[in-house]
């Protein structure tokens, strides 16, 4: 968690007012996200916590611009977000990137790793740089995530382990340097050791480029470990939000208290009868 400074005025990078998403109509209507308000500041690590079906992934898709907002308004850098048309949406996506739960599904299986990283440089506007300089930049990005670029050349992403694939995703973010990173359950499919490494790398990257990181997770323990701000989501609504310390150590909402009580404690005897 970041040490707060009350005198520090940080700008809003993503703000939502009454953001709502409705699927279907009539009797088949489902309100997935129900009039939520939020204000994500530059450089913060924000975690949206909720169980499956709470609406957090639907909200993340609206933040990314993958699906439309039914009601309400999303503001980007202080102004109403305008991503109508391919050109505006492409420009927006230069500044907001995502890491998903399944890294394998994020890659084109026919693209070699060097092509994946080169695409990032081209997207960033480095297409005309000498190849020697591009190689140096890709080497630096891989080094940041403890990978060796020379060992990845001519390999495909599917030849890497799950943890290595997620580290490669972070290398992409290192090259792209977006203003916002949305990480949807980025550590749920990798082992505990790799999970800790990935979280440390994302925190370090936030510190280096002042990137806003939005985590989507069901793991309230993870939220406490890494977050500056936490939003608790239940049935499409935010039932509680604020500083991570306040929300998780001094919860007010019954749902938040239940999420915390469900976290196994190492000193308690676990009930394995239902396993």
Q: Where on the chain are the PLM-derived regions?
A:
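Helix-to-loop junction immediately C-terminal to a conserved catalytic motif
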Residues: 64
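A short, surface-exposed alpha-helical micro-motif characterized by mixed small hydrophobic
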Residues: 223-225
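Conserved ABC transporter NBD signature motif
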Residues: 72-82
